[in-house]
């Protein structure tokens, strides 16, 4: 660590949307954002779980618009920057401008790990707006460290000043993480930051985040009580406790985060965010974590096991954006019974 301060990026109000089907109220957003700000996290990501304009039949309709959620959070924060997520093809540069006007100052432009080339316009426009612009390579387990580094280099070339390794399936272990950060560090400019976005499907969210920091990672994504898709993200309060034990500087208030996790976030979970049969299957099969709730719905509708659907999706190497294939797979499994 060499005494540097970690950048703590909270994702409770974006990835956490998946855990409750994108149904945060504006009051929920204000209370959680204020608690995070009081605990001195560096940024608070706010959007539909699938990013700006993710509210749709395919991904699930949100209780509010992205702009309403962003404005609600921006109204109560004094220290943290408001961040948002944009997936090219779902959100547009017009949506990004509106998010900026609503108060977002950080954007993570997210693509599948082999499709960085679709992010060029969005990254360039974000830089023109003056936003802190981050490249976000989802499902990073699905390509080699060397290929991932080449994709990261593309995003850097478009103007991203930080590139994330994103374990969307919660499928990687510490060696996988180390290999990817070493590859990125060898390819990127020294001044380009790196970030880690973990999921906890194999219970390795915190361990993988620690491994990333040990390899020089600058920014860590985490969420209160792990609130996120699948078994959730690296639980923020747990990561901070572990970072304290390691003597790392993070600038946040551990006990305030612990209180926010248990008092504000955990009570909102209509399905526990934890490692269980279904979420473990996500990590084991390497499936996009936000498929969980969609798979459980399809399993109930067609009289199937959600695990069977998840395993088949993994075999077919489905990726984020292919949520419509969940029903196809379910029908295939039912017909083959």
UniProtKB/Swiss-Prot annotation:
UniProt xrefs under CDD domains: DRE_TIM_HOA
Catalytic activity: (S)-4-hydroxy-2-oxopentanoate = acetaldehyde + pyruvate
Pfam families noted in UniProt: DmpG_comm (PF07836), HMGL-like (PF00682)
UniProt-listed Gene3D superfamilies: 1.10.8.60, Aldolase class I (3.20.20.70)
Site (Transition state stabilizer): 14
Top-level EC class as recorded in UniProt: lyase
Superkingdom, taxonomy of origin: Bacteria
Pathways involved: Aromatic compound metabolism; 3-phenylpropanoate degradation
GO terms, molecular function: 2-isopropylmalate synthase activity; 4-hydroxy-2-oxovalerate aldolase activity; manganese ion binding
Annotated binding of Mn(2+), by residue: 15, 197, 199
Job of this protein: Catalyzes the retro-aldol cleavage of 4-hydroxy-2-oxopentanoate to pyruvate and acetaldehyde. Is involved in the meta-cleavage pathway for the degradation of aromatic compounds.
Assembly information from the UniProt record: Interacts with MhpF.
Entry-linked PANTHER family: 2-ISOPROPYLMALATE SYNTHASE 1, CHLOROPLASTIC-RELATED (PTHR10277:SF9), HOMOCITRATE SYNTHASE-RELATED (PTHR10277)
Name the UniProt record assigns to this protein: 4-hydroxy-2-oxovalerate aldolase
Native source organism of the sequence: Escherichia coli O9:H4 (strain HS)
